[in-house]
């Protein structure tokens, strides 16, 4: 008799997928908004757009991202409830850069084997971060890929949509000479540069359970620190009457892949130059540790890691005090780190690299000067 081959024998466990959905239901239900229609398990997530239709000229903003090789740290430690939090930060915080309010998000998880508790932990992290960001988690997909991924391997990605009034879009033409550059502290490495970090610690022979005095915890715990999610606080900042009265926020930049200078250059218009003084802040210990362990050149570390700055806000001088006070009150340490100049009159330091428009954006330029405290 010819042997029967089932889907389960091919490596796909439908029942495990169903169990994962049951385990994640409670957390997903908390990550919602009043506009969400329908429930978990539908073919499509639905979002009532009535309020959007009442806007003068609504513009939708969308973003897609992942968490890169940080998942390898989570897999090595078998800790999966923070990687979803990272995913939300990477996706929804990009949307806020243009002034939009993130509304809803979907996720995608590909794995070699569905372990219900692991999938539920990942989605639980996504849901917690969505709840914090005031974003609805309206759907997702878990795909089992036996033979393509090892049983303990997975990757995840997400996509989100937001909305902004056309008149309120934070475009580069809002930024002016004399604007002040504010740094918003990161929670650590966030979710960029982990291929470099992993290579460095492997080269140094450091185990993830190594206690690191400078961190006050293990290396693995430091590397899995969740990405700070700025979305809700920045949406509120853009609408705060005291900040608006001082001239409002002129620009925002999410410091992700490419580092501080490159991402700041993306939001500057041609003809403007930003000078950022490293002496205005001290990066958390993890950045110096990675650099010294791997003998990583300064230029490379700054093109790869956020160096303790997760977001940048550009504001007129009259809005500096109200903006920093607002963000400090929300638990986001914020400080003055530089200023915007006319490119023709900018104080260029010949000893430091000037970064011009990055990632395909033909914009302004940025120079990091000085040394960290």
Predicted regions and their residues:
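Buried hydrophobic packing segments
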Residues: 24, 46-49, 91-92, 197-200, ...
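Glycine-rich phosphate/pyrophosphate-binding loop regions near the starts of catalytic domains
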Residues: 23-187
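Short, acidic (Asp/Glu-rich) active-site segment that either coordinates a divalent metal cofactor
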Residues: 64, 155, 168-220, 261
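Short, acidic Gly/Pro/Ser/Thr-rich loop/turn segments
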Residues: 17, 53-54, 67-70, 165-168, ...
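Glycine-/charge-enriched secondary-structure boundary and capping motifs
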Residues: 2-9, 118-136, 149-156, 214-222, ...
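Residue-level signature of catalytic and energy-coupling elements of molecular machines
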Residues: 13, 65, 178, 254, ...
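N-terminal amphipathic/basic leader segments beginning at the initiator methionine
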Residues: 2-37
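Acidic-glycine-rich active-site phosphate/pyrophosphate-binding loop
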Residues: 58-60, 66-68, 171-172, 206-210, ...
